Amino acid sequence: MGEISITKLLVVAALVVLLFGTKKLRTLGGDLGTAIKGFKKAMNDEDVGVKKDVDGGVQAEKLSHKE
């Protein structure tokens, strides 16, 4: 009863297509793809910024202990 079979998935997919239509689903898929690309680009840009901060940071002076 709780199993998900291929026929159940096909029925759900057919209902989604009937409810939203193919044009709306195509638009939704394009928007989702654009959002994912933007997210990945932002993550890569953030990583590059962090690396620049680490590499280009000011080094601390070495202190010697005087007795």
UniProtKB/Swiss-Prot annotation:
<keyword id="KW-0811">Translocation</keyword>
<protein>
    <recommendedName>
        <fullName>Probable Sec-independent protein translocase protein TatE</fullName>
    </recommendedName>
</protein>
<dbReference type="InterPro" id="IPR006312">
    <property type="entry name" value="TatA/E"/>
</dbReference>
<keyword id="KW-0813">Transport</keyword>
<keyword id="KW-0653">Protein transport</keyword>
<dbReference type="GO" id="GO:0033281">
    <property type="term" value="C:TAT protein transport complex"/>
</dbReference>
<feature type="transmembrane region" description="Helical">
    <location>
        <begin position="4"/>
        <end position="21"/>
    </location>
</feature>
<comment type="function">
    <text>Part of the twin-arginine translocation (Tat) system that transports large folded proteins containing a characteristic twin-arginine motif in their signal peptide across membranes. TatE shares overlapping functions with TatA.</text>
</comment>
<dbReference type="InterPro" id="IPR024905">
    <property type="entry name" value="TatE"/>
</dbReference>
<dbReference type="InterPro" id="IPR003369">
    <property type="entry name" value="TatA/B/E"/>
</dbReference>
<keyword id="KW-1003">Cell membrane</keyword>
<keyword id="KW-0812">Transmembrane</keyword>
<keyword id="KW-0997">Cell inner membrane</keyword>
<dbReference type="GO" id="GO:0008320">
    <property type="term" value="F:protein transmembrane transporter activity"/>
</dbReference>
<keyword id="KW-0472">Membrane</keyword>
<keyword id="KW-1133">Transmembrane helix</keyword>
<dbReference type="Pfam" id="PF02416">
    <property type="entry name" value="TatA_B_E"/>
</dbReference>
<dbReference type="GO" id="GO:0043953">
    <property type="term" value="P:protein transport by the Tat complex"/>
</dbReference>
<comment type="similarity">
    <text>Belongs to the TatA/E family. TatE subfamily.</text>
</comment>
